[in-house]
């Protein structure tokens, strides 16, 4: 959540930053401006009534001590108190309105994030490993998966519906091996392995920014205040919800392997074949809670940690800086890692490492104590990696002319 104090003090600066997102925030901001204007006006009136109440109360006390008639002052105090209570209630309601409207407004755009109108304005930072030159036309992963008997898409539809799949045979062994490899690399880089619930309550989804704005993107358990997690970012970050840690414990670095569940609202017609876009998928996540001065360096560390896995699997990839219009709701700055898919002849996102600054920390009340003072931490999150998409990249990049798949050396010991 944006700092309410900053919003009240410098609305224009906040509005200018949010307009960089290019996602029609004007109406929401204008409504928020109206509420804030009304709130400030009533707050001034309230402060005036409080000052008047204090002044008359002193006069009342003096006259009482002097045993002078105080009936007029008493009546004045009673009338003013009624006004005070009514106005205080109104100010409280307006403050709640501001908080509610703030909860659906995205994070401020970081100064390092380039201005852009769409994903077309994202900027490639660097490429790692050169894509292989094939002597044959490379197949897409769903062809290879079916040929090798690794993924059963029809059974996924039978058991659930479209955008579900069944991984079996040697494909299941590779899938499991990828998870183990990812966790081992992340642990080597200082991230604590944690297993969390796959269900969370509404407060946790509010803390990381999925609710209330993106309710249609998550699966809710009927008649329960529980939701299936869209990412382990939710559980790992919220382990420290409403918590104050000592500055000596920072940074807190965590990794988790979880199933993730997304409704994919608005994705009709996109990636309908294969494993690129599923309702249920596995992901190994990185989350860090840091001192504000250390979050930029942590973002680089998390990117390199994810890249290290792709290099070990001999998968060409690149870093892409997202522009202002392509940022996620909670992110202030995001760098994607895209992996090369020769079957599709393009790079596709496999990780997205975001610095949310203090946006999530303010929503979730994640703080640290330094010099006897409580401060908001910075939180970061990123995939390391999306397991299904890594398997897709492995199949497409390491396919042989006969459709068999070469297994990278780094993965052999896990099989």
Swiss-Prot record:
- Where does it localize? Cytoplasm
Any single GO BP term = selenocysteine biosynthetic process
Where on this chain does ATP bind?
A: 262-264, 349-352
Binding-site positions, L-serine: 231-233, 285, 383
Q: Does the keyword Kinase apply?
A: no
Q: Show the InterPro entries listed in the entry.
A: aa-tRNA-synt_IIb, aa-tRNA-synth_II, aa-tRNA-synth_II/BPL/LPL, Ser-tRNA-ligase_type_1, Ser-tRNA-synth_1_N, SerRS_1_N_sf, SerRS_core, tRNA-bd_arm
Its main subcellular localisation, reduced to a broad class, is: cytoplasm
Enzyme kind, highest EC tier: ligase
Its annotated pathway reads:
Aminoacyl-tRNA biosynthesis; selenocysteinyl-tRNA(Sec) biosynthesis; L-seryl-tRNA(Sec) from L-serine and tRNA(Sec): step 1/1
Q: Which GO terms describe its cellular component?
A: cytoplasm
Q: Does the keyword Cytoplasm apply?
A: yes
- Enzyme Commission numbers on file: 6.1.1.11
Q: Tell me, how does this one assemble?
A: Homodimer. The tRNA molecule binds across the dimer.
- Role, per record: Catalyzes the attachment of serine to tRNA(Ser). Is also able to aminoacylate tRNA(Sec) with serine, to form the misacylated tRNA L-seryl-tRNA(Sec), which will be further converted into selenocysteinyl-tRNA(Sec).
Annotated NCBIfam families: serS
Q: Which HAMAP family match?
A: Ser_tRNA_synth_type1 (MF_00176)
- Record's comment describing the protein's domains: Consists of two distinct domains, a catalytic core and a N-terminal extension that is involved in tRNA binding.
**Name of the protein this chain belongs to:** Serine--tRNA ligase
Q: What is the lineage of its organism?
A: Bacteria, Pseudomonadati, Campylobacterota, Epsilonproteobacteria, Campylobacterales
